[in-house]
């Protein structure tokens, strides 16, 4: 008798955030339930969904938004929800760890078990995205998590612009890549629109590694008061799911709330990945230059 292929249905959520934690967590739960109704097994919520994207401004008071990982109320609530519905939920949050702070995601398995933590590795610093003020560079390294439905890799927002991160997770056996995100307009340049670039970069990761990829981004205009006036970002959504050759399988627009779903045959994709040869023909002995900042070759 032929073995059944492993089918997994993934989902990306997209919604506008208020600056009220309870409202945002309730919205996330409502959309998780909607995704479950559509058959989703692994459901991605956007980055730092508990409130506004506070990193627009450097304000000491915003450190009060951070909470310790263990016993975090939103993680506990999502554990209960995951167990009730039998779904996997990566949960993004602002983590306080003694005197360190991280942009983190906890991976909740379908029985409510917390599988562990990933801390954002690449921390941006620019107008409107002043994350270095709040977050230490992550110390977990890129990881994969064996969930009930698939082995997954999860990284966060700015990580998605680095092909090394996607490849590191794929090399560890990630069968699907997930990127919770908060990205939109550039306060210093009204003419800069990165949405298409943003999507294409990750479609490239999917195609280069022959794995599906899920990206969840917020929508809506958020205004943060600063000492120099207001900072404003309009988040452009554009959440999407890409297939293992980089093709767009499901995509949202820039204004509407969305629940995107797509199903993948993991065994079929595994065969394609092995047959394509990109892992067979790798030359790690020639890649040492990737371990340098200036491109110098350390091999004499």
From Swiss-Prot:
GO terms for biological process: putrescine biosynthetic process from arginine. The active site is at 47 (proton acceptor), 120 (proton donor), 157 (nucleophile). The keyword S-adenosyl-L-methionine does not apply. InterPro entries: Aliph_Amidase/BUP (IPR050345), C-N_Hydrolase (IPR003010), C-N_Hydrolase_sf (IPR036526), N-carbamoylputrescine_amidase (IPR017755). Homooctamer. Belongs to the carbon-nitrogen hydrolase superfamily. This is N-carbamoylputrescine amidase. It comes from Solanum tuberosum. The lineage of its organism: Eukaryota, Viridiplantae, Streptophyta, Embryophyta, Tracheophyta.
